[in-house]
Amino acid sequence: MTTAETSYSEADITVLEGLEAVRKRPGMYIGSTGPTGLHHLVWEVVDNSVDEAMAGYCTTIEVILCEDGSCQVSDDGRGIPVGVHHQYEELTAAEVVLTVLHAGGKFGGEGYKVSGGLHGVGISVVNALSSRVEVEIDRDGSRYYMDFVDGGRLNTRLATSGASPDGRTGTTVRFWPDGSIFDETRFRFQTLSERFQMMAFLNRGLQIRLRDERSDGNHDEVEYQYEGGIRDFVAHVNSSKESLFAQVGYIEGIEEGQEVEVAFQWNTGFNADGLHSFANGINTLEGGMHEEGFRSALTAVVNRYAKKRNLIKDNDENLQGEDIREGLTAIISVRLSEPQFEGQTKSKLGNVEMRSLVQRTTNERLADWLEEHPQEAKAIVQKAVNAQRARVAAQDARRSARRKSALDG
């Protein structure tokens, strides 16, 4: 046995120890071994492709549920790098990405200024929890192939298999979830479809296709692509409601590589919880700094406009946030290089600077939008005034009922 072979073997054992930890405690990395964890494998692979799209290099992602129970994800991005990795001289960069935890362009490198990923653990976790993984890379005019078995053991080392067809670039990953790890290994088409639609809304112009080729499936096929981005998202959410006005409003701001975009439209309903926020494509269900910035600026801007246009009197009580948000459907999407999420589920954004950016953008751009759309602005204020009256009347009725019960008692 040569020294090079010995060195490679030792390095490989170290790498496999990392993946073995994932197999022993999968819940720590993907949340569970039930349906949520199973589908997390797909998200982890697709998120890599979406990162390529956010960086401006990928326009199409195709996901196929194959007849043999595997899932195949293809994109037309740059392709995973195939050169020797600077830290692991025995392995190519592509092999490192598939076998080392937290390896990849999004971890401290220059590959991506902005990236998502629910837990950011990387595609190596998919490898660890699969019985087989096949990877095909088109890059620099050549097609490369490698595969892994039994939870990440390198079976076929990365090697060129010919020229890339038509000069194609991109990555294709096909994986078979390990039945000894997961409670079930059948993917749910509807679960995938709903999430891919959301991803397409959040990445304007990105085409995402999903196809079911399983013999026991319905052979469904869907394709999502939205040139209007989050504007189309708001229109979709409001499609079953009666809109207060036809147009979906839109504002955006960019500062030092940080981006915010907001789409909004009011409807005639009474819900005040129609605000949905995202950070780097991740649904921040518990809100965070970006939502705080929008809420405070929205309240201030609408009150300023209403008083300036004499839609409410100077000595009248200000409209409260809940009055203004009644019937509002809004999508806030921010992109930032180093998001700070509270909790492993990434459900709340903690970056204070994002509150300032969203607040400034909303203060300036929403004020301009209201001035440019006086009819819509008047309808927004009138709805908020009606909500305020209903709120005050309800408070008065509660006070009156309490006084009456106190006297009766």
Where do the model's predicted regions map?
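Residue-level signature of the cytosolic catalytic core of signaling kinases
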Residues: 11, 34, 86-90, 226
